[in-house]
């Protein structure tokens, strides 16, 4: 697949096949996603892979999804969930600790979005459907 085709064809997938995704494949996708650009190359994105059915079920609740019932159903049926987190206090800062711009430390939100899209495109290339659910804030 070429990049333009992947960008045009990749879709959010909320109905997943009833089979596990090999951990090795998820790891490969994460490794590719780590090449996503970030503010001043701070590389703040971190990935947590959840492929244990009991732990996935624990994520599929009102508290984690802020009551979005559709997200609860999507998570509950997923064979794996990848949580994208960021390292706080690195993006938007100079080496002396001062802010680089008036956006202060909010660059990590942009970096997380870039990393999430890169992950989804890599997953698509590997034949794995994905959807971005932005519901955790803590």
Predicted regions located by residue number:
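Basic/polar, acidic-poor N-terminal "presequence/leader" segments
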Residues: 27, 39-41
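Glycine-rich, charged/polar anion/phosphate-binding loops
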Residues: 31-35, 66-69
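Specificity-determining recognition surfaces
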Residues: 1-27
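Helix-loop element at the rim of GNAT/NAT acetyltransferase active sites that forms part
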Residues: 9, 35-36
């Amino acid at each position: 697949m070429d990049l333009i085709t992947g960008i045009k064809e990749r879709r959010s997938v909320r109905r997943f096949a009833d089979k596990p995704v090999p951990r090795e494949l998820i790891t490969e996708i994460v490794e590719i996603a780590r090449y996503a650009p970030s503010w001043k190359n701070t590389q703040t994105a971190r990935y947590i892979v959840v492929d244990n059915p009991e732990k996935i079920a624990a994520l599929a609740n009102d508290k984690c999804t802020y009551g979005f019932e559709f997200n609860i159903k999507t998570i509950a049926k997923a064979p794996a969930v990848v949580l994208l987190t960021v390292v706080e206090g690195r993006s938007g800062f100079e080496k002396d600790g001062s802010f680089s711009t008036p956006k202060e430390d909010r660059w990590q939100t942009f970096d997380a979005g870039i990393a999430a899209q890169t992950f989804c495109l890599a997953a698509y290339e590997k034949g794995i459907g994905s959807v971005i659910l932005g519901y955790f804030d803590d």
